[in-house]
Structure formats: structure tokens, C-alpha cells
């Protein structure tokens, strides 16, 4: 049984053109919680998907400034994790948990 905290760490898979390109290098991209650390992300991916993780790289994409009905606003910042899997391991993010 997986710990419920793992579901709070991994928010959603990031399915973009770049994330599908890095999947060829045995990497998967996830949107993660802002306060999540690399060891927490590694433990969550290994527990939820049953795979071996070799590396975790993180980045914070700053929210864009947008206008809505004449008022200036800002989109939220998003933290992403690029997870490198061990050789022979794979995750199908389209099926979900």
C-alpha cells in the first residue's frame, strides 16, 4: 500500500511536445508540489509506479503576466520534475494511476 503523501507530491504528468521528446531518453516530466524536494519526488515516483529512478531534475516555471477584462493578473508558478528512469523501465502517463 502506498503512502497517501505520495499523491500530494505528484500533481500531474506534464504532457507537452518537449516532454514527449525527452521520453525517448527514458525520462518522464511531472508537475509536482511547490515544496517537494528531490528525494520526496524520487520516493513518490518509485512507490506509485513501481520503477527505479536514477535522477531527478527540478525547475520552477514562473507564471506569465496576463490580462483579463482589462485587469492585469499573473498565472501561478509551476514546479516541474524531470525524472530519469533506469534502463529497461518505463511509465505510461496516459493511463493514470
From Swiss-Prot:
Q: What does this protein do?
A: One of the early assembly proteins it binds 23S rRNA. One of the proteins that surrounds the polypeptide exit tunnel on the outside of the ribosome. Forms the main docking site for trigger factor binding to the ribosome.
What processes does the entry annotate via GO biological process terms?
Answer: translation
Q: What family is reported?
A: Belongs to the universal ribosomal protein uL23 family.
- Origin organism is Rhizobium meliloti (strain 1021)
Q: Does the keyword rRNA-binding apply?
A: yes
Asked whether the keyword Transcription regulation is assigned, the reply is no
User: What name does UniProt use for this protein?
Assistant: Large ribosomal subunit protein uL23
User: Record's Gene Ontology CC terms?
Assistant: ribonucleoprotein complex; ribosome
* Superkingdom of origin organism: Bacteria
Membrane-spanning intervals of the chain = none
Tell me the subunit arrangement: Part of the 50S ribosomal subunit. Contacts protein L29, and trigger factor when it is bound to the ribosome.
Q: Name one Pfam family in it.
A: Ribosomal_L23
The protein's matches in PANTHER family, at most eight in alphabetical order, are given as:
60S RIBOSOMAL PROTEIN L23A (PTHR11620)
Per its UniProt record, what InterPro entries does this chain match?
A: Nucleotide-bd_a/b_plait_sf, Ribosomal_uL23-like, Ribosomal_uL23/eL15/eS24_sf
Amino acid at each position: 500500500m502506498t503512502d497517501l503523501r505520495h499523491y500530494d507530491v505528484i500533481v500531474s504528468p506534464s504532457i507537452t511536445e518537449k516532454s514527449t521528446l525527452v521520453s525517448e531518453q527514458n525520462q518522464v516530466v511531472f508537475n509536482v508540489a511547490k515544496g517537494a524536494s528531490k528525494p520526496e519526488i524520487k520516493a513518490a515516483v518509485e512507490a506509485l509506479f513501481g520503477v527505479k529512478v536514477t535522477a531527478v531534475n527540478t525547475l520552477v516555471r514562473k507564471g506569465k503576466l496576463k490580462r483579463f477584462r482589462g485587469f492585469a493578473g499573473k498565472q501561478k508558478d509551476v514546479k516541474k520534475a524531470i525524472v530519469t528512469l533506469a534502463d529497461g523501465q518505463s511509465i505510461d502517463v496516459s493511463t493514470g494511476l
